[in-house]
């Protein structure tokens, strides 16, 4: 009996040991898988860092040309550059939180400044937009504002390499931006003087889509259906924007967009935002 008990105990210990080995193997596989995902997230974030650097570099170059047009009193050239140069900034807007106080200096609207009782501090592209499109003049104040804009654009460009960009900021920033497009920008409040809102919308969508494209390989391993749903909704939004392309590679005035199409666009962006908000699954 004692011998049998000893044999049973030995067998139990052997099974337990094998079980522990299997458990260790499973833990090892999970750990390697987690390390793999972390490496992919790091690589995607690094690629987005590079993308943001490129956009801000082009933004600075474009701003230099824009300011030169202001200095030369070239209203037509300044207006031609305005929406196109801003697209570089708008593509970077998912991570504008990382820009600190340079974001409001460059991109604040008068309505926002009034709400905060800071209208005397108003500066940036939208202040110059008002001068060009509503006041229809370039004066010494406009030129001074242009120089300040260039100074801020240079500072942002210099800061680009030190921006604290994380997967969480990228994901949350893209969702928040599209929500802003669908709920407030769609009213035309962003480009209230120039009505070049469609350029902004396109750039915002491109910025969010860049984030999706970079994380797509990771997402497809976790949830292929969700990834396909996001892609389908991006396609729908872009199709609606394409409807208002002009013959010069730009976009029609937002004033030409019908109420029906504004609603359709807002609905499409909302429909995109819903699955996009679930992309955080890649960090789990």
Swiss-Prot record:
Chief localisation class: membrane
GO cellular component entries: plasma membrane
Cysteine disulfide links: none
Domain of life per record: Bacteria
Signal peptide residue numbers: 1-17
Gene3D superfamilies: M75 peptidase, HXXE motif
Pfam families: Peptidase_M75
Keyword annotations of the record: Cell membrane, Lipoprotein, Membrane, Palmitate, Signal
Lipid-anchored residues (N-palmitoyl cysteine): 18
S-diacylglycerol cysteine-type lipidated residues: 18
Subcellular location: Cell membrane
Topology class, membrane: Lipid-anchor
Similarity section: Belongs to the EfeM/EfeO family.
Protein name: Efem/EfeO family lipoprotein
Organism name: Staphylococcus aureus (strain NCTC 8325 / PS 47)
């Amino acid at each position: 009996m004692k011998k049998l008990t000893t044999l049973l105990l030995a067998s139990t210990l052997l099974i337990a040991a094998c079980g522990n080995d299997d458990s260790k193997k499973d833990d090892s596989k999970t750990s390697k898988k987690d390390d793999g995902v972390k490496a992919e997230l790091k690589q995607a974030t690094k690629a987005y860092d590079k993308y943001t650097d490129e956009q801000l570099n082009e933004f600075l170059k474009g701003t230099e040309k824009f300011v030169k047009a202001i200095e030369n009193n070239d209203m037509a050239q300044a207006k031609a550059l305005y929406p196109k140069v801003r697209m570089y900034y708008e593509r970077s807007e998912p991570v504008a939180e990382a820009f600190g106080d340079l974001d409001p200096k460059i991109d604040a609207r008068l309505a926002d400044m009034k709400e905060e009782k800071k209208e005397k501090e108003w500066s940036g592209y939208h202040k110059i937009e008002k001068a060009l499109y509503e006041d229809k003049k370039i004066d010494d104040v406009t030129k001074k504002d242009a120089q300040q804009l260039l100074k801020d654009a240079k500072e942002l460009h210099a800061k680009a390499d030190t921006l604290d960009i994380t997967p969480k900021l990228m994901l949350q920033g893209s969702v928040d931006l599209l929500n802003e497009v669908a709920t407030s920008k769609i009213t035309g409040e962003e480009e209230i003087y120039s009505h070049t809102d469609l350029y902004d919308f396109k750039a915002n969508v491109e910025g969010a889509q860049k984030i999706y494209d970079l994380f797509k390989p990771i997402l497809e391993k976790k949830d292929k259906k969700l990834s396909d749903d996001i892609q389908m909704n991006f396609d729908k939004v872009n199709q609606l924007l394409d409807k208002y392309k002009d013959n010069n590679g730009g976009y029609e005035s937002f004033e030409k967009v019908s109420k029906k199409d504004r609603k359709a666009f807002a609905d499409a962006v909302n429909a995109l935002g819903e699955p996009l908000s679930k992309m955080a699954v890649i960090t789990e």
